Amino acid sequence: ELARLFAEEYHRTPIRGYGTMAHTYLHAIGQGTPWQQATREVFDGKGSFGNGAAMRVGPVGAYFAGDLKKVTDEAIQSAVVTHAHPEGQAGAVAVALAAAWASENPKGEGKAMLEFVLMNTPVGETRDNLERALDLSLESRPQEAAALLGSGQRIISQDTVPFALWCAARHLGSLSEALWATVAGE
């Protein structure tokens, strides 16, 4: 159902800035190709590990906060319709976990959030970079963090999610400061 809704919205507004591969699979889904097939066919049959699933999953984590299994399962389900590659799904899981943790721990510490996310994110490159984020001092400059973790310029989970979560951990109490740190890391 979610894939169908994405495809319908795409056909209503195809020039909204979708990524190249999103054009490919959303068009295919709209033409009747099953989403499971369409999303796996991109990138030489490996599926996307872009950061789109991670960008939209925050509310899933907040909604299911308190139920770790549900947060993880629902994050994967929301990701798989557009991101068949395990790294794209891992990024969504990590962001959902961070949102769940933050909604349960409004006065929590950034390092504790990163530890929680790291412990529960699937094994892979996204998780490896989250481990680097945890090891990096929250007092480091955003430019240093971006040099180590990536800054999202590659538009993939592996280099977007760890940096974004490091910025969030660094400024848990201030959305504005977290966003400025993210921009400073370019």
Predicted regions, residues:
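Structured, active/binding-site neighborhoods that engage oxygen-rich ligands
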Residues: E1-E186
